[in-house]
Design a protein with these regions (language model features):
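Short basic/aromatic active-site micro-motif
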Residues: 142-162
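Conserved tyrosine-mediated DNA breakage-rejoining catalytic core shared by Y-recombinases
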Residues: 63-95
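Active-site/catalytic core of tyrosine-dependent DNA strand-transfer enzymes
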Residues: 26-29, 93-143
Length: 206
């Protein structure tokens, strides 16, 4: 087996993990952000907050630097996966949390990456996934597979739930934000397609 086969297996593994990750209920996600900060785990609190409030992929969050998000109303990224430009607005609550985390983390400067390990290097995606599994156990989260993708899905589900009266419009917006090629992909990504299929059984009665 050559390197090509190994690479294909890694890609398939990542693709599979992205479709099987679950999402947090919004209230539980917000409680987790607060609990992590209370326990002085400001880096992971910031990670969860950014993931849930922006819907960015983990690779794009890890590439962020303080100067992009500190005291900013919005910031722009070039998505690593797609190469497309995306502008993200930071609401007031998230701005405050970013400032609080910055004060407690005390990075070497605003040019520094926002998520740096004790070794002085940016966290890897694999390490973040390990940390999130530890967080799930410690805080007894009501979620199956908790990984980096869970934060992005939590964002998507909350946007969808908050716009239930115009759900199709919400899906179109999410499709564009996620850079999906169709609404059906977005529905499948958020687990909505599976829910629709399962709800079919509830229509039956004696």
């Amino acid at each position: 087996r050559g390197l090509g086969d190994v690479y294909k297996r890694q890609v398939m593994s990542l693709k599979y993990s992205s479709t099987t990750a679950d999402y947090l209920q919004w209230s539980e996600a917000m409680n987790l952000i607060r609990k992590l900060a209370k326990d002085e785990n400001y880096k992971i609190s910031l990670l969860v907050a950014l993931g849930c409030f922006t819907g960015l992929r983990i690779s794009d969050i890890l590439a962020l630097r303080w100067k992009q998000i500190l005291n900013a109303e919005e910031f722009t990224v070039i998505e690593i996966k797609t190469g497309k430009q995306r502008t993200v607005r930071i609401n007031m609550q998230l701005q405050k949390h970013i400032c609080d985390c910055y004060k407690h983390i005390s990075p070497i400067g605003i040019d520094a990456p926002i998520l740096v390990s004790r070794k002085g290097t940016v966290y890897s995606i694999q390490r973040i996934n390990v940390i999130l599994k530890e967080v799930k156990r410690k805080y007894r989260l009501h979620i199956g597979n908790f990984s980096c993708h869970s934060l992005r899905k939590t964002f998507g589900r909350q946007v969808y739930n908050m716009n239930s009266e115009s759900s199709e419009l919400a899906l179109v917006k999410l499709m564009e934000l996620f850079n999906h090629s169709s609404v059906s992909i977005t529905k499948r990504y958020l687990g909505l397609r599976q829910e629709e299929l399962l709800n079919t059984y509830d229509c039956l009665s004696f």
